[in-house]
Amino acid sequence: MFKLKYFILLICIATSFAACKKAELYSPAAQFTADTTAIRAFITANSIPAIKDSYGVFYQILEPGSGSFSYSGTTKVTVDYQGRLLNGTVFDDSNGTPRTFTLGGLILGWQIGIPYIQKGGKIRLLIPSYYGYGERAAGSIPANSILDFTITLTNVM
C-alpha cells in the first residue's frame, strides 16, 4: 500500500512536468519558407511556368483578358474558379456558375493575384498558406495549406 502511494505520487509529478512542457510555437517565416519550397517543387514536378511575385505568390497567366481596370479593395469581381490543395483535392468550385465578391473581402492571395488579369482573363494562383488561411483550418482545408486556384474573371466593376 505504501509503495502504491509513492507510485501514484510519482505519476502525478511526472504528469505535472509534462503539462508544463512548452508547445511548439508557430513561425510564419519558417512556414512561408516551407511553403515556397513546396510550391517550387510542385511547379517543377508539374512543368508549370509560374512566376513568383514580390509577395511570394506564384502565378501563371493563362489568358490576360482585356481592358485596363484599376483594382481597389472595393472592386467587385465576378469569377468562375476552382480551389485545390497541392495533392489535387478540390475544396471549392463554382461549378461553372460565376460568383461575385468584393476583392477586399477575399483571401490575400486573391487580392494580390486577381489584379494581374483583366475581364475575360484566366489565372492560376499558387498561394502560400500565409496569404490563404494561415495556421487555422477552414472547412475541409487543413491549417498551413498551400492553395492552388484556377480563376476566370468574367466581370469586374
Residue spans for each PLM region:
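Cross-family detector of peptidyl-prolyl cis-trans isomerase
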Residues: F2-Y6, S16-M157
